[in-house]
Each structure stands twice: as C-alpha cells, then as structure tokens.
Amino acid sequence: MAQLVQAPAPVPDPLREQLRMLVQRREQLVQQRDDERRRLHQATLAMVRACLIEQIGDLRRRIQRMNQAIKQVRCQLDDALAHALGTVPGIGEVTTASLMAYLPELGTLDRRQIAALVGLAPYNVDSGQHCGKRRIRGGRATIRRVLYMACWSVVRTQASFKERYQQLRARGKPAKVAITACMRVLLIRLNAMARDRTPWREVIG
C-alpha cells in the first residue's frame, strides 16, 4: 500500500503566497466568464445579451491582467524552474504557475513521495470482493486537476505518452485509469526536471 506522505511544511514564501492568490483569483474569473458564456448562449432578449457580452469582455480583460501579474511573480519566485516547466508541451504559463504555487515540494521529494503527496500513487485493495484492485487516494486534488488537463495535451503531442495511453486502453483499462497512469509518469518527469532544472526531453522508443 502506498504510504500517504506528510511532507515537511515548506518555509513560508511571500512570493509563493502572492502567486497562489493570483492563480486562485484567475480561476475564479475564468469560472465567472464561462458562466456568463453559458448564460449568453441561453439568452434571447437583446438587452440581456448586450449586458452579458459587455460582462464577458470585462472578464476577459481582467483575466489578461491577471495573466500578466502571474507571469511576473512566477519569474520572480523561480525563473529557472518556470523556464524548465514551460518547455513541456501542453504546459503553459498558467499551468506552470499552478504547479509552482500549489506544489512547492516539486523537485525536493523522490518519485514515490511526490506521487503519494499528489494522490497519484496506486495502492492495492485486497478484500473478499476486490482482490488486488489498484486505487489512488488522498493527495492534492487541485494539482491532480492541473495535471489532468496538461496530460491530455502531452498524450496528444508526445509519442511515448500516446503509446502508453493507447497500450493501457488496448489492455482494457478505462480511459480514466489510463490517463491517471500517464499523469503519474508526467508528474515524476516534472519532479526530475524541477530537481535538476532541466528542460523537457521526449523519450524515444
């Protein structure tokens, strides 16, 4: 069974806290924008539609300003790490910032510890009804959501990840299980990159 990791509490960092608050606020603004877009799709009254269009435009501008602030703080926090993570296909500036804000332990733990910390380390469920089933539990749901979105981009663009995903699906694994396995591999790769401050390299063969 994978052991749940109780990582040492990171030393408080004012810049990291700023980054976390900016990322959280951006997430809120994106959610508001998406909600307004859905309302626009349903609205039929011209005045209501005009109001929604104006609101969506305002939210878009706020998100852009938040993106600029996130980029500035992220580079101040750790420019080398930001650059390394930014070389991963499918991982843009906001994803990089989310990893830096919500996972300060990245690069400081070994592969098993980082997987367990995030909640991507599988463990066996042995019982009279379910013998040998593999599950994941606990961990940081926010980081798993970030990795989930990023991993689909990596699977689409990187041959080794695409092959891994397809092999798992061919063996009868559900899509969720297959992408979770790829997320675990991606996290381990990111952890090594953060530790060594090295760029992404596609694994051939």
Model-derived segments and spans:
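Long, charge-rich intrinsically disordered scaffolds of nucleic-acid metabolism proteins
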Residues: 1-87
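Generic hydrophobic alpha-helical segments
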Residues: 85, 164-165, 190
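Basic, amphipathic alpha-helical segments enriched in Lys/Arg and hydrophobic/aromatic residues
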Residues: 170-205
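Phosphate-backbone recognition surface of nucleic-acid-processing proteins
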Residues: 93, 98-171, 175, 202-204
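Active-site catalytic microenvironments for nucleophilic, acid-base chemistry
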Residues: 4, 102, 106, 189
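Cytochrome P450 C-terminal beta-domain/meander region
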Residues: 82-89, 135-139
